[in-house]
């Protein structure tokens, strides 16, 4: 009997720990934004996100050439293959305007507005 109670408590503790870990993962995912590159232009060219929340930017490159999503202020740099998709994870940010560009095509520019 004592052994089965111990196993039950171990199971409850394990289930609770896994549930808490799952909640942390869900909270850490934050805001997901999507942007498309077509004809070497970002669409939309301005993204908006809440402050103090992790941000995930999904970039879909519809062009026939690769592109490099880059931002000095966001501290990110990601090469995305032609007709490919990439994901950039950004730390929590204070309110402000954070510019990004395609390093392979300097005319392609956009901004992340954090409020």
Question: What does each model-identified segment do?
Answer:
Residues 45, 53-57:
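Structural beta-strand segments of beta-rich domains
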Residues 23-34, 41, 80-115:
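Extracellular/periplasmic metallocenter environments
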Residues 11-21:
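Bacterial N-terminal signal peptides
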Residues 2-13:
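Bacterial N-terminal signal peptides that target proteins for export
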Residues 55, 65-67, 110:
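Short beta-strand/loop motifs in extracellular/secreted proteins, especially
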Residues 59-61:
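Asparagine-centered strand-capping/turn motif at beta-strand->loop junctions
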Residues 45-47, 75-79:
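Beta-strand-rich interaction surfaces with strong enrichment in secreted/lumenal proteins
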């Amino acid at each position: 009997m004592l052994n089965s109670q111990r196993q039950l408590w171990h199971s409850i503790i394990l289930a609770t720990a896994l549930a808490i870990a799952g909640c942390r993962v869900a909270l850490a995912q934050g805001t997901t934004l999507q942007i498309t590159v077509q004809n070497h232009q970002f669409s939309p060219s301005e993204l908006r996100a809440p402050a103090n929340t992790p941000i995930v930017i999904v970039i879909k490159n519809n062009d026939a050439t690769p592109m490099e999503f880059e931002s000095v202020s966001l501290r990110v740099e990601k090469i995305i293959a032609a007709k490919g998709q990439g994901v950039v994870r950004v730390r929590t940010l204070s309110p402000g305007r954070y510019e990004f560009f395609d390093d392979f095509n300097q005319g392609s520019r956009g901004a992340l507005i954090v409020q």
